[in-house]
A protein has these predicted regions:
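Internal active-site segments that recognize and position negatively charged phosphoryl groups
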Residues: 138-170
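A glycine-rich beta-to-alpha transition motif near the start of alpha/beta enzyme domains, typified by
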Residues: 1-111, 162-280
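Extended Gly/Ser/Thr-rich low-complexity repeat segments
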Residues: 125-136, 270-275
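Ligand-binding beta-strand-loop-alpha-helix segment within the catalytic cores
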Residues: 114, 122-124
Length: 280
């Protein structure tokens, strides 16, 4: 039986199946993601990371959500950086990873954490994208079955909508309103939904609904989006700790500069998956 070698990794509880590009070259990657990411029925993960050699740099990555859609992922980027070093794609601690959102600088820190530059956030409606006017799109009212919710929408490589609340939503509200906003017609490519509590100017707490994945324990581009949005609203400074159920991520942003994301990237286990279970 032909098997697929894989690594299981996570960044603050945001977990991924990681595979080498050459081992899946003949497979349909969206279908592979749908199969491998199914919890309880397969390996289970928030996404599939496919890692190979880049055209202009040593490492290239692609990320697929559990529903098969391709996306940008900050925690996935940091896991790819760690995986690339462990598997010998690069020798140094600083290098560049090619992504669908451009080239991203990464650095493995002495304490084992990984730092990544995600680029500058985008606020223009056409780049988020969101069908609204003004830049940035702040306090956009969305009428839900339970009432009006105001969101601030932006892109940090992926589309996010931030909701500031005094306390994180309970399951009923979270599971009702999050998918409603994700699939709202205002968002042509859907949106992740970030329920955010500002605990101090340097500390945020989130509950996360990711487009294409549902609830996740952490989200790297989402942590960046929440930190940037809090700064836009005058609620936070340039350096912010973002807590979510999976742990803490550290975000730094100064207007006009790239957003940087720092946190752990951990190898959980490695294994082999029977390829006969996945059709080309």
């Amino acid at each position: 039986m032909v098997v697929l070698p894989f690594s299981k990794m996570h960044g603050a509880g945001n977990d991924f199946v990681v595979v080498a590009e050459e081992s899946v070259a003949s497979l349909c990657l969206p279908e592979l993601a749908r199969r491998l990411c199914r919890r309880r029925f397969a390996i289970g993960a928030d996404g599939l990371l496919v890692v190979g050699r880049g055209k202009n740099h040593a490492v290239r990555m692609r990320m697929f959500n559990p529903d098969g859609t391709e996306d940008v992922c900050g925690n996935g980027l940091r896991c790819v950086a760690k995986w690339a070093v462990v598997h010998g794609l690069v020798a140094g601690s600083r290098f560049v990873v090619e992504t669908m959102d451009g080239h991203k600088r990464v650095e493995l820190l002495p304490d084992g954490r990984v730092k990544a530059e995600l680029g500058e956030p985008h606020f223009e409606p056409e780049r988020v994208p969101v069908l609204a006017e003004g830049s940035p799109v702040m306090n956009l009212p969305i009428v839900t079955p339970a009432g009006v919710i105001h969101v601030t929408s932006l892109s940090t490589g992926s589309t996010h909508s931030v909701i500031f609340t005094d306390s994180l939503p309970d399951d009923d509200r979270f599971l009702r309103d999050s998918p409603f906003i994700e699939n709202h017609p205002l968002f042509p490519q859907r949106t992740s939904v970030l329920w955010t509590v500002v605990e101090s100017p340097s500390r945020l707490r989130m509950r996360i609904w990711e487009r294409g994945a549902g609830e996740t324990l952490a989200c790297g581009t989402g942590a960046c989006a929440a930190a940037v949005t809090a700064q836009l609203h005058g609620l936070a400074g340039e350096s912010v700790e973002v807590y979510s159920p999976g742990g803490v991520l550290y975000v730094q942003w100064r207007p006009g500069s790239p957003v940087t994301l720092t946190g752990a990237a951990e190898l959980v286990f490695e294994g082999c998956y029977p390829l006969s279970e996945v059709e080309p």
